[in-house]
A protein has these predicted regions:
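Short loop/turn microsegments at loop-to-beta-strand junctions
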Residues: 24-25, 46, 120-121
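Short, internal strand/loop/helix patches
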Residues: 94-129
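Structural microenvironment flanking redox-active thiols in thiol-disulfide oxidoreductases
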Residues: 60-97, 107-113
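Hydrophobic beta-strand anchors of alpha/beta hydrolase catalytic cores
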Residues: 48-49, 79, 123
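Thiol-/selenol-based redox modules, centered on thioredoxin-like
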Residues: 125-165
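Bacterial Sec-dependent N-terminal signal peptides
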Residues: 1-19
Length: 165
């Protein structure tokens, strides 16, 4: 009986993990002023989730590239950086990006667990219909390739081509 109960517990936790091409799960997140937001606010546009941490160098590079991407494509895509840091660390972080930076005030435990966060950066692309198109962990090249296939962008294309050489 114990084995069966453990199996059910593991099976239910697997069921909670995001699956490609399945509908996204909505989460409540907060901006730095404490205003409540939901990812579904942007349904109808491509949504890029970037799970980030203050001490993560690849995250800083990704934020810089995504800031330009967002400014060129904000009519069809939203970018949301979700902090995996604790609330105090995140509140003290200073950034200069034009896209949304949100936190769940809990080190991204729930939303991070759903998307399989165990290392930053983690990238998620959500289709305008709300289905998950892409999840990648710490691979800038693979993420930008998939992003460019869904939301073509000349600058992202240049970055991808420069890495091919």
């Amino acid at each position: 009986m114990f084995f069966f109960a453990c199996f059910l517990a593991v099976q239910s936790s697997w069921a909670q993990q995001a699956q490609l091409y399945s509908p996204m799960k909505d989460f409540t997140l907060y901006d730095r002023k404490g205003n409540e937001h939901k990812v579904s606010e942007f349904k109808g546009k491509y949504i890029v989730l970037l799970f980030t941490s203050q001490d993560c160098e690849p995250c800083k590079e990704a934020k810089s590239i995504l800031d330009g991407f967002y400014n060129r494509n904000k009519d069809k895509a939203e970018v949301i950086a979700i902090s995996a840091d604790d609330k105090d660390t995140w509140q003290k972080e200073t950034t200069n990006v034009s896209f949304n930076e949100w936190s769940d005030n809990n080190s991204a435990k729930d939303i991070g667990s759903y998307y399989g966060l165990n290392l930053c950066p983690l990238f998620v692309i959500i289709h305008p219909n709300g289905n998950i198109l892409h999840i990648s962990k710490a691979r800038l090249g693979g993420f930008f390739k998939d992003l460019n296939e869904n939301v073509p962008d000349a600058e992202i294309e240049k970055i991808l081509n420069s890495h091919k050489k």
